[in-house]
Amino acid sequence: FRQVMQTTVFTLASAKALTQSRRLIDTQVQLKEFLPALRKSSWISLDTEADSLHSYPEKLCLLQISLPDTDVLIDPLSQIDMTALFKALASRELLIHGSDNDLRLMYAAQQFVPSKIFDTMWAARLLGFTAFGLNDLLSKLLGITLDKGSQKANWTRRPLTDKMANYALNDSRHLRALTDQLRDQLKSKGRTTWHEQICNKLIRDHAAPKETDTGQAWRLKGSSKLS
């Protein structure tokens, strides 16, 4: 595999001198101003954050979107109407890492189902990577090490700290470069079709979510042997 030997600790703040207020979209006006750039963008990568560690059921707390020239955070907790946003996303290929949770959150929030995704985690698994977390892949393939200090943060917190904002944006902004490398490797190994089939199944599964069987949800393998 092609690797970059020099590892760099990367934070968004050191790469782009943006204040949080400029990269956080939490009003209808800001969202409307952002949509033209989204619609004409040559690619779109995204990630989400939820409050699963602090409440149940979990809900979508943050949507991170990266385009060639910008990275933004969109705040669903601000009660903005995201209908136009998801309509714009629906017809595009979305670059996502480990899309299962993201797709579930976006469906629950807006009944959103994308038409096409490229899941970098599943690409790595098909290529035989034994460590396929985002940080693992970025380090191995791009020489980038991310600060994961906000991994267990409370994403309902407002305002977001700079550390939280940087953590969130870093999860989406490198996905295009990672996708390019993984897509090339899938093609060279003849596994592109397999990956497309997996991504399509992920989309189908979230387009028709199954009702939760509350009894089944609490059954554990071997639980009948407990006393």
Language model region names:
Residues A165-S227:
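Mixed-charge, glycine-rich, non-catalytic linkers/tails in nucleic-acid processing enzymes
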